Amino acid sequence: CGNGIRCVGKYLYDNGMTDGRTTITIDTLSGVKTLELTVKDGKMQSARVDMGAAILAPREIPVDMDGENVISAPIVVDEKVYHMTCVSMGNPHCVIFQKEDVDDLDLTRIGPKFEHHPLFPERVNTEFVNVLPDGSLKMRVWERGSGETWACGTGSCATGVAACLNGFANKNEDIVV
């Protein structure tokens, strides 16, 4: 959880457990994460996390599909065909780019159908994304086991990777989500 690791970093700093260091590493289930803490007047203001490389191999995500990656692949949910790009940031994500406004989605109905789809043996987090005219991305997230969530660090990372893979964004440029 990208936001969770930032909260842990703040807790550690605020409770004197970093010895004043502003670069710390934390061992997680998805590997060692490095946090760069921004401190002002002795208080931590923000944390930047190196989330690591995205995983695109279907077996490692996991998604039950063949090939080297899953980019704009069809998936049928509720008799509707969506196109998904699958990415793992240490947890599985299914990113759906769509023209329909994500605000109009009945996420409490459709989210669980993606989460429990047979293609995802460990269930999946799903990001529904609009590419806006200015190139920014508007998304809603269905988090496996939690439901709709208002902030998802790994989901934002997965969406950024998927946007690059689908030609909606460029590598090494800022992406506004």
Regions found by a protein language model. Name each.
Residues 1-150, 160-177:
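Active-site proximal loop and beta-alpha junction motif in alpha/beta enzyme cores
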Residues 154-156:
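Helical hairpin unit composed of two closely spaced alpha helices linked by a short loop
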